Amino acid sequence: MIKIGAHMPISGGFKRVPKETHEIGGNAFQIFPHNPRQWKAKLPKDDDVEIFKKRVKEYNLTEDSMLCHSGYLINIASPKEEIWQKSLELLILEMNICKTLGIRYLNIHPGSHLNSGVEKGINQIVKALNIAMEKEKETFILLENVTKKGGNIGSTLEELKMIIEMVKYPERIGITIDTCHAFDAGYDITNKEKLDKFLKMIDKLFSLEKLKFIHLNDSKNELGSNKDRHENIGKGKIGVKGLKTFLTNETIQKIPWILETPGDNEVHKNDIKEVFNILGVKQ
């Protein structure tokens, strides 16, 4: 069975997420564990958690279909001590929020080295992850591929591999592949042969077992543009034909898909319908 959903709003509490996921035609979801544009965060209230967990069961949402996405301000690759420390503290709190909600996976962007160099940036990431995973021992961290702009680390699979090889607990780290980011970084996932090569590379570097989620987005920009601007399904440069190549791949169909396309729940509902239209599947 295909698992698909979208990034869902949490204003009004976590408790609303399972029901709204069902209403848009989803059986998977992603959420922020707090306001992503603030350093402030706190553990959710007991009643919110209780209703959330009850509805997770009610709507048959499984552990492998629920994902938290780290806040925008976190940069554990930063060479600036104050930012790195604040990022580490917030990351640990996010992991504890995940644990409280019963969500196993936390997706993070590796971060930007801010012109300090990839090697130093990776060392900072590894140091932070080692401390965080010592402090909170249940959450599974997913490193997301990104585009190269702004000193970002993780635009290549090899950079993600370096991080995983260096951490103390590699068994608690996996990856998320974002289709827009991959396409914009120069990986042609619209071509069957090149997609197969891309997946073989993932298997060789990490094993496909490490690939836990797909961020399913079209791209506003051309292959290799390094822009990172998401577009709605079938309306971008990946397009219907390219997405069909990607989505009909047997390996890809075994991994949950999370939409991060522009728009609200109603737009995401239509994007999910478009995904099934591309697949030729009736809902």
Swiss-Prot record:
InterPro entries recorded? AP_endonuc_2 (IPR001719), AP_endonuc_F2_Zn_BS (IPR018246), Xyl_isomerase-like_sf (IPR036237), Xyl_isomerase-like_TIM-brl (IPR013022)
On the tree of life, the source organism's domain of life is: Bacteria
Which free-text remark accompanies the cofactor? Binds 3 Zn(2+) ions.
Question: Is Zinc among this UniProt entry's keywords?
Answer: yes
Q: Which cofactor does this sequence's record say it needs?
A: Zn(2+)
Which EC number(s) does UniProt give? 3.1.21.2
PANTHER family, per this entry?
APURINIC-APYRIMIDINIC ENDONUCLEASE, ENDONUCLEASE IV ENDODEOXYRIBONUCLEASE IV
Q: Which family does it belong to?
A: Belongs to the AP endonuclease 2 family.
Name of the protein this chain belongs to: Probable endonuclease 4
Species of origin: Thermosipho melanesiensis (strain DSM 12029 / CIP 104789 / BI429)
